[in-house]
Amino acid sequence: MTQDEMKNAAAIKALEFIENDTIVGVGTGSTVNFFIEALASMKDKIAGAVSSSEESTKRLKAHGIEVFDLNSVDVLDVYVDGADEITRHMSMIKGGGAALTREKIVAAVAKKFICIADDSKQVKVLGNFPLPVEVIPMARSYVARELVKLGGDPVYRQGVTTDNGNVILDVYNLEILDPKALETQINAIVGVVTNGLFALRGADILVLGSKDGIQVIQ
């Protein structure tokens, strides 16, 4: 299977975790785009979706899936999203598509977080993929200096503004041995909205597409 075929296979498998008449949390990214296509096949069986980005909202609506504001939803049974990296402990780096804050909010509300990915995303240690940090614009330089103190090499992602009106610093050369501690430490920097470590609230289930087929890891 090609990488896209692995992503698509994982996306289709994730439909098995979607119950009828529920509102589905939907993430953002290339793998999630396959999931949205798959979800459209059962759109008449679900109540609708909550989306983590403007891009996913457009795709969902284009398929005739109703999109709810998260503030109007008390509970989400399932949130389905991809990852840039994920470990066997279900900690992730996310945010390559700059939607990390909304992704983290929707994940916090969901009872179950299902990560869909191809096997290139599974790693032993997080940090080869640069860690995105969403920052209030006026704090960009200050936050960058603080991230250097933590051993990282932050790079301003030019030309990118998040759905929340903020900027992204991509932090290179971090060997993340304690994801929960680093997630907390970076979030404590004044001016940081959040960072792309999903360790305090990691995935509950990983649906992994590989050349050998689909693995479901819990």
Curated annotation (Swiss-Prot):
Residues bound to substrate: T28, G29, S30, T31, D81, G82, A83, D84, K94, G95, G96, G97, K121
GO molecular-function terms, A-Z: ribose-5-phosphate isomerase activity
Catalytic activity: aldehydo-D-ribose 5-phosphate = D-ribulose 5-phosphate
Active site (record annotation): E103 (proton acceptor)
Entry's Gene Ontology BP terms: D-ribose metabolic process; pentose-phosphate shunt, non-oxidative branch
This protein's pathway: Carbohydrate degradation; pentose phosphate pathway; D-ribose 5-phosphate from D-ribulose 5-phosphate (non-oxidative stage): step 1/1
Cellular-component GO terms for this entry: cytosol
Keywords, alphabetical: Isomerase
Top class in the EC scheme: isomerase
SUPFAM superfamilies reported for this sequence: D-ribose-5-phosphate isomerase (RpiA), lid domain (SSF75445), NagB/RpiA/CoA transferase-like (SSF100950)
Highest taxon listed in the record's lineage: Bacteria
EC code(s) of this entry: 5.3.1.6
Family matches, as PANTHER family: RIBOSE-5-PHOSPHATE ISOMERASE
Job description of the protein: Catalyzes the reversible conversion of ribose-5-phosphate to ribulose 5-phosphate.
Family annotation (NCBIfam families): PRK00702.1, rpiA
Similarity comment: Belongs to the ribose 5-phosphate isomerase family.
Subunit and interaction comment: Homodimer.
UniProt protein name: Ribose-5-phosphate isomerase A
Organism in which the protein naturally occurs: Colwellia psychrerythraea (strain 34H / ATCC BAA-681)
Gene: rpiA
